[in-house]
């Protein structure tokens, strides 16, 4: 789990010099650390064992004077600092929520429209709404006529008054608290909506047809009109079964899909999830997807035996193309863990996949996530959180990250960075192997921001201490103070530090 060096170069604003001091590998840490208190150095990371910890490097010497420019600290990308919150978004949003950030103060949620006072779970009957008389309303950030609704912090725009089509609807927010309903965005046959992306001013809304099969797509250039966009038909021909796909656009404009692959598992016995996730890429996100190596592959040993399972929807929903509900899979042993209902996001070049986590042994389902420094590399397991079948999605909004599920509890996080890290750098100015001047102790941390034109690519500013006031010297030393200030299991785990020098 390494941060891409290429991205670090970008955030420095210049090329890493050969003379820069980088502590990255397990060997680097062992060779350069002078003392560690309240932490352990394991597998190339410094992990606190107490609430507070300190790390001091040895003095890095040189034969000529050098001026330090900056210190950058990278943490483990495991991203465990999530905080539970009550249901995110409209209270009457049904089924799996789909999130889409168009830009600052422009956040969207898609789901089924329920005429009930609480979000219903898939398969549950909605409670009938009481009698209500709508009244005109005003809301900051909206210049269209609005009406009140029986749901708290929710309003109807003109598009929201148009009749439903049986598919997903759109709600918009400027603050992730108040939501304006703009009406349908997919037809009834597209009720199994799984993901959305933003491409050149248009929303790509992906859905399975039939359920758990080939991803199709609506392209919508007007989310406000209460009318579904243009149905472009099948986007990805699923070579297996499973879909429940998540889509993400890279910075070159290519669209990637992460898709469930049920070929190694009896999915009906494992919450319709799988240990295997396929990955395909397309230039436009509408067609031409080419499959790559799997994004997730936690299969156990294949037995060579073939089993079958039954799906309830294929023949019913698409009898033209599906003559049977029976599918085959290769039996694997021992029992496998299963993942699915994928959602993707990229933070400063580090990719994350969030999805269902159904552990082996019949334990409680939860949200699980994986990470990789490249969308083209296999993802590594991070952790899990919550309870129940989540069907999650993730978005960046209002300066933080929101993880929405179809359960009663959602989650929010300031980002992968875990507070608190304080740093100072010292310099030996007279070549006596002693530090003559230190900087003040300064708290450093990463920050995150939108990238114009991209919904799921998030910019990262590194945790950096600028050292322009430090004089030239023959030796430099780094000291770090770590304090676990969170109320969850996360802690500031150091993975890499870089002391850059002026040329």
Language model segments and positions:
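Beta-propeller domains
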Residues: 76-83, 87, 110-180
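Blade-edge beta-strand/turn elements of extracellular beta-propeller
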Residues: 79-88, 176-187, 223-238, 284-334, ...
